């Protein structure tokens, strides 16, 4: 079974969103990359662990919308704070 890069012991809140995991991608999130990642990793993670965050460190196109339970971030996430639920 595949697991996310960071599977949280307890849910955390990031920008008002409850997350259970974080997946890190050292790639740019274009439509093809995001749809591929959703199908092969991210949607299965939401089914197993609940909602989570995917970070495209080099950014993503603005037109991408969060899939259900999957929240998109870029490298600026390092400026954000996680807090306990």
Q: Residue spans of the language-model regions?
A:
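Mg2+/Mn2+-dependent nuclease catalytic core
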Residues: 27-43, 48-49
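Domain-level recognition of nuclease-like catalytic cores that cleave nucleotide substrates
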Residues: 58-85
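A short acidic/basic microdomain associated with nuclease active sites
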Residues: 1
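Hydrophobic/aromatic beta-strand patches that form the interior of the parallel beta-sheet core
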Residues: 22, 53-55, 71-73
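Metal-dependent nuclease catalytic cores in nucleic-acid-processing enzymes
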Residues: 46-58
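Conserved catalytic cores of phosphodiester-cleaving nucleases, focusing on short active-site segments
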Residues: 4-31
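Intrinsically disordered, low-complexity regulatory regions
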Residues: 7-9, 48, 60
């Amino acid at each position: 079974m595949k697991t996310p890069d960071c599977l949280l012991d307890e849910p955390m809140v990031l920008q008002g969103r409850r997350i259970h995991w974080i997946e890190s991608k050292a790639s740019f999130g274009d439509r093809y990359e995001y749809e591929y990642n959703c199908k092969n990793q991210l949607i299965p993670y939401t089914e197993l662990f609940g909602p989570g965050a995917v970070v495209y460190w080099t950014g993503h196109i603005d037109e991408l919308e969060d899939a259900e339970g999957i929240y998109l971030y870029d490298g600026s996430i390092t400026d954000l704070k996680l807090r306990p639920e």
